[in-house]
Regions:
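Processing junctions and N-termini across compartments
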Residues: 96, 111-114
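Extended, Lys/Arg-rich, non-catalytic nucleic-acid recognition/anchoring regions
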Residues: 1-96, 120, 127-232
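The −1 position to Zn-ligating cysteines in a subset of zinc-ribbon hairpins
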Residues: 98-101, 116-119
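Cys/His-coordinated zinc-binding microdomains
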Residues: 103-106, 121-124
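Non-transmembrane amphipathic alpha-helical segments
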Residues: 18, 99-104
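Short, non-ligating residues that shape and space the ligands of small metal-coordination modules
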Residues: 108-111, 126-127
Length: 232
């Protein structure tokens, strides 16, 4: 038993050392992202939270564990509820700021050429978060969001539109991460964005953009991500 414990301890230590090397390599800016995308974690809840760190650290792991007990392990129900929570958190506690990677320009210079910023999609905007996102109880957050929804949440062409689009995008990514158990790339690379479009009759509609890696989620994950977007 002692030998096994030492073996596990050595595995963790070696993994930490490898991650340090990888982070140093990524920091040089020769890759699309400046940090290692694959996080280390212990269980589904922890994996999902680490996977969603790009949405800003929050209490997702504890929420998943609580909801898993509440819904008797029904992962689809948990995914939908987590999507609602993350969407509400991003809308209520989020604020529009300049993208940290490009400084708000929407472009990244690499040597003699310029490319669209990967992090913000060329918009120059990103989302910052207030401290409440890490301390507010999720039930209180959902109640507050329900009150907010009694009046229009966004206006076309306004900052509230970008905030709402980003909040829905965050919710879809979070729900998909739970569905795929936090082990697939689909929530990171498969969901590109969410946007409000205008129909011919002037009514708004929601468009979710996907990329090739969404295929790793399988048909159920892909279909449920659209359902989650509709619910949000």
């Amino acid at each position: 038993m002692v030998a096994y414990a030492e073996y596990i301890k050595r595995l963790h230590a070696d993994a930490d050392a490898i991650y340090e090397i990888a982070e140093e390599a990524r920091s040089k800016g020769h890759d699309p992202r400046m940090s290692v995308e694959i996080p280390k974690a212990n269980d589904l809840a922890d994996r999902t939270q680490k996977l969603l760190d790009f949405l800003h650290p929050r209490q997702t792991a504890d929420q998943i564990r609580e909801l898993t007990k509440e819904y008797d392990g029904n992962r689809e129900r948990v995914a939908i509820e987590i999507a609602k929570i993350v969407c509400a958190e991003s809308y209520l506690y989020g604020e529009i700021v300049d993208c940290a990677d490009c400084g708000g320009s929407g472009e990244i210079k690499k040597g003699n050429w310029v490319s669209e910023c990967y992090s913000c999609g060329g918009s120059g905007n990103s989302m910052g978060f207030k401290d409440e996102i890490g301390i507010s109880a999720w039930r209180d957050t959902l109640s507050l969001f329900a009150e907010k929804k009694k009046s229009p949440l966004w206006k076309l062409g306004d900052d509230t539109q970008f905030l709402s689009e980003l909040a829905i995008y965050h919710g879809v990514c979070a729900g998909l991460a739970v569905l795929t158990e936090g082990i697939l790339v689909a929530p990171l690379e498969g969901v590109v964005s969410s946007r409000f479009l205008t129909n011919e009759d002037g009514s708004p509609s929601l468009a979710i953009s996907f990329a090739g890696p969404i295929r790793s989620a399988g048909g159920t994950g892909q279909a449920l991500s659209v359902l989650i977007a509709d619910i949000l």
